[in-house]
Amino acid sequence: MEKETWRFIDSGNESPAFNMALDEALLYWHSQKKIPPVIRFYGWNPATLSVGYFQNIKKEINFDAVHKHGLGFVRRPTGGRGVLHDKELTYSVIVSEDHPEMPATVTEAYRVISEGILQGFRNLGLDANFAIPRTEKEKESLKNPRSSVCFDAPSWYELVVEGRKVAGSAQTRQKGVILQHGSILLDIDEDKLFDLFLYPSDRVRERMQRNFKNKAVAINALAPKRVTMDEARIAFKAGFEEGLNIHLEPYTLTSEELAFVNELAETKYASDEWNYKR
């Protein structure tokens, strides 16, 4: 069977506002049939705390710590919880809901898209699997997360290695298009991460941080030898091609497309109105 060709964009390290604006722009262009489906890789400059669309930042985020660590801050167009984007490869997938390979339900679409990430981990010699809830109680706990921290628990069809979460993803559907983006951790600074949230007491923070060590892990804590960012890019690009049975064709934005993204970044994702609205 002939492989479908998707676009591949590696946009490098960009500002938090630019990163979210480009994901939204790709979703919009795909909905207009201007571009085929897209896989995008990116990084962050500066390292950034992103929060989910629905998160209440006044109750959950410690902005003194965000500033102390020199981090950027942005609200995502997707749901989910707080993510520290630091030593990671971030990816996004943009594809129509009516694509013949895309299931109708959110969780099943997660599984299909995440096949690419699963293969990427395997390309790095890590035995990754999907975390599928086994009981009704586990299903319920996924619907009602107790923590503000995204990597605190594997959610439905998240990827785990040795029982610990290795990639966190969030999804939105707009204009008939699926946008899934997520983090693939190479390394993690747990103290910095846990500084960024508010807790009822120090004891609660200590307990959550202790539990976190048992639930989440970065690639370089597991890999037989250190994985560089370039090696991760190669492994996961090949992983998406294998997992989704596609061919990825590199693409560079035109000057007009870039201008559109920069304007969206400035007017929406860099604005206090968007970032601090709840």
Curated annotation (Swiss-Prot):
The active site is at C150 (acyl-thioester intermediate). GO terms for biological process: lipoate biosynthetic process; protein modification process. One of its GO terms (molecular function) is lipoyl(octanoyl) transferase activity. Residues 33-248 form the BPL/LPL catalytic domain. Its EC number is 2.3.1.181. Gene3D superfamilies: Bira Bifunctional Protein, Domain 2. It is an enzyme of class 2 (transferase). InterPro entries: aa-tRNA-synth_II/BPL/LPL, BPL_LPL_catalytic, LipM, Octanoyltrans_LipM/LipL. The record marks K165 as: Lowers pKa of active site Cys. CDD domains: LplA (cd16443). Belongs to the octanoyltransferase LipM family. Catalyzes the transfer of endogenously produced octanoic acid from octanoyl-acyl-carrier-protein onto the lipoyl domain of GcvH, an intermediate carrier during protein lipoylation. HAMAP family: LipM (MF_02118). In the reaction, the free carboxyl group of octanoic acid is attached via an amide linkage to the epsilon-amino group of a specific lysine residue of lipoyl domains of lipoate-dependent enzymes. The reaction proceeds via an octanoyl-thioester enzyme intermediate. This is Octanoyltransferase LipM. It comes from Bacillus velezensis (strain DSM 23117 / BGSC 10A6 / LMG 26770 / FZB42).
